[in-house]
């Protein structure tokens, strides 16, 4: 959980440094300031988003604390699946894939790759475009344009939760100032008190500015970046499918088509040419494929 680790680092360094200067943590405990900042931030989030955006943001929050499912093994499964589908269509004709795409969960080919079956976005993307290709009513350029449009739509939808969190993060420092000003107003209204008490009230008011900035840049705004990164991973998978299928439509053999798809992947997850070649060879031999997946 890198997010939780990052939060611990933020809290440890900020409050640890404060203690090193001789400060008291008790002075930073100001529930009223926190209520003002958090409440105003939540309120601005509700005001600035429609119901669809709010629901999408809440739905995206659990994804922040899950490990990425788009690993090297996932990409290898994707390329192997596409290879098997393309090889079958080349050997037996495109119409031989009808049963596979009509009910992929009962397909022998798809069943070999449970990680792909578990990803409804990728499964629908693959099946839908194979169905369009089989129909024969669209040429390569039309299919490519439609794929680009769907990928762009996915990215736009994924950007909504990220933007919502980013805007909340941007607003928190301002709400911290609001809380601080209200605290200063309270302190000035108590100007007849002794200097020691007045100083404590002003110090408490300044905690609002501190909390607003800390919550914004240490906790909320980084979450928007994580959501964008997760969206980019899904888009990369879709681009890999797009390039692979279009290469096959343009006449390239399945081994070359999956090589096109491999080249679109990020270097951190991209299998080497030899790894992909060995994986494709294993695909050609069902027994060897089963052994490889069990391992």
Swiss-Prot record:
Record bears the keyword Metal-binding: no
Pfam families found in the cross-reference section: MotA_ExbB (PF01618), MotA_N (PF20560)
Stretches of the chain forming a coiled coil according to its record: none
Main localisation: membrane
Phenotypic consequence of residue 96 to L: Suppresses pdeH disruption motility mutant, swimming velocity is between disruption and wild-type. In the wt background velocity is reduced
TM helices/strands, residue ranges: 2-21, 34-51, 171-191, 201-222
GO biological process: bacterial-type flagellum-dependent cell motility; bacterial-type flagellum-dependent swarming motility; chemotaxis; proton transmembrane transport
CC terms in the record's Gene Ontology section: bacterial-type flagellum; bacterial-type flagellum stator complex; plasma membrane
Residue intervals on the Cytoplasmic side: 52-170, 223-295
Entry keywords, A to Z: Cell inner membrane, Cell membrane, Chemotaxis, Flagellar rotation, Hydrogen ion transport, Ion transport, Membrane, Transmembrane, Transmembrane helix, Transport
Intracellular or extracellular location(s): Cell inner membrane
Domain of life, per lineage: Bacteria
Periplasmic side: 22-33, 192-200
Main function: MotA and MotB comprise the stator element of the flagellar motor complex. Required for rotation of the flagellar motor. Probable transmembrane proton channel. Overexpression of MotA, with or without MotB, restores motility in a pdeH disruption, (a c-di-GMP phosphodiesterase) suggesting there is an interaction (direct or indirect) between the c-di-GMP-binding flagellar brake protein YcgR and the flagellar stator.
Family: Belongs to the MotA family.
Quaternary structure and partners: Each stator complex is composed of 4 MotA and 2 MotB subunits; in E.coli 11 to 12 stator complexes can be involved in flagellar rotation. 2 A subunits and 1 B subunit are thought to form a single ion channel, so that each stator complex contains two channels. Interacts with FliG. Interacts with flagellar brake protein YcgR in the flagellar basal bodies. In another study YcgR was not seen to interact with MotA, but instead with FliM and FliG, also in the flagellar basal body.
NCBIfam families tied to this protein: MotA1
Name listed for the protein in its UniProt record: Motility protein A
Species in which this protein is naturally found: Escherichia coli (strain K12)
Gene name of the encoded protein: motA
């Amino acid at each position: 959980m890198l997010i939780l680790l990052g939060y611990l680092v933020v809290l440890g360094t900020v409050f640890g440094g404060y203690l090193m200067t001789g400060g008291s943590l008790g002075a930073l405990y100001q529930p009223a300031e926190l209520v003002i900042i958090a409440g105003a931030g939540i309120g601005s989030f509700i005001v600035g988003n429609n119901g669809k955006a709010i629901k999408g943001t809440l739905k995206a929050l659990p994804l922040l604390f899950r490990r990425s499912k788009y690993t090297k093994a996932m990409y290898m499964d994707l390329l192997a699946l596409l290879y098997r589908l393309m090889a079958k269509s080349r050997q037996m004709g495109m119409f031989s894939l009808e049963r596979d795409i009509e009910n992929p969960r009962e397909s022998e080919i798809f069943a070999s790759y449970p990680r792909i079956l578990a990803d409804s976005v990728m499964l629908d993307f693959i099946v839908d475009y194979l169905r369009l290709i089989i129909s024969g009513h669209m040429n390569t350029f039309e299919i490519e344009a439609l794929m680009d449009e769907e990928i762009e739509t996915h990215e736009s939808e994924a950007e909504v939760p990220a933007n919502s969190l980013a805007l909340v993060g941007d607003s928190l420092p301002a709400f911290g100032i609001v809380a601080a000003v209200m605290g200063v107003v309270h302190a000035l209204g108590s100007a007849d008190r002794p200097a020691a008490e007045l100083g404590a009230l002003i110090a408490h008011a300044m905690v609002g500015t501190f909390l607003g900035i800390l919550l914004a840049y240490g906790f909320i705004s980084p979450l928007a970046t994580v959501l964008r990164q997760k969206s980019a991973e899904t888009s990369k998978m879709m681009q890999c499918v797009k390039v692979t299928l279009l290469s096959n439509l343009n006449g390239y053999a399945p081994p070359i088509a999956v090589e096109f798809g491999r080249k679109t992947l990020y270097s951190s997850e991209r299998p080497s040419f030899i790894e992909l070649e060995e994986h494709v060879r294993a695909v050609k031999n069902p027994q060897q494929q089963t052994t490889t997946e069990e391992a």
